[in-house]
């Protein structure tokens, strides 16, 4: 009977040790999850702060670029605007000829001076 009693005492002590270890582990887990949540919240706040900063920087860069462009070319000269308009009109006029040539449906659109290059260019266009 004494051995059962000592065994019961031993098991009771072991049970108390296990419970204290369990309590200690639960406390560590709580601390760890608390630290992770704190770290996660801190990281989220840092991310939001960085996003706001990056957005401000992008706006500043856009504003600086716009200011630079206006200083670089304040107003194009009328002669330059006229030249640009005539250039684009010429391009639009010649697009159909070149389009057919590049699709391989028409001969080289400009005079005969470059006729020796035509077969190469046309074969390239057909590929």
Swiss-Prot record:
Per the UniProt entry, the signal peptide is none
Q: In which compartments does the protein localize?
A: Cell projection, Cilium
The protein's UniProt keywords, in alphabetical order, are: Cell projection
Q: Does the UniProt entry include the keyword DNA-binding?
A: no
Give a Pfam family name.
CEP15-like
- The protein's superkingdom reads Eukaryota
**Which InterPro entries does the record associate with it?**
CEP15-like
For this record, an example GO cellular component is: cilium
Q: What does this protein do?
A: May play a role in ciliary assembly.
Q: What is this protein called?
A: Centrosomal protein 15
Gene giving rise to this polypeptide: Cep15
